[in-house]
């Protein structure tokens, strides 16, 4: 399944979604604000995951738009650390979306819960602080001059 979702993300990227998102972010972002770039990348990963249902599909789009050109090439981030933290940010979106049916809706059906969105409602209080912590850890630890 992850291979198919990654392929879906690649198709979105090849269709120009990554370039369009990159143009929008370069127009909005201050050019020398590392923190803003980290926020856009992590929040974008979470948002695209909410829409597409899985971080594997969101990863190629956000990496082509923000991750590679800004965080790696411009700010010289540690590639493995930045992209691992980006996937974690995407997984925060997975916790909050019914599009990730295999994680959120199927268990509710199998457990015969009264509220099919119960797992999502229970996971949001974890997902939001985890996303904030992911942004802070990436900002503080994944770039030259950071804590690591």
Where are these regions (language model features)?
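Transmembrane alpha-helix interface/packing and boundary motifs in multi-pass membrane proteins
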Residues: 5, 9, 43-58, 88-95
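Core transmembrane alpha-helical segments of multi-pass membrane transporters/permeases
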Residues: 1-17
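Membrane-interface interhelical connector segments
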Residues: 16-35, 74
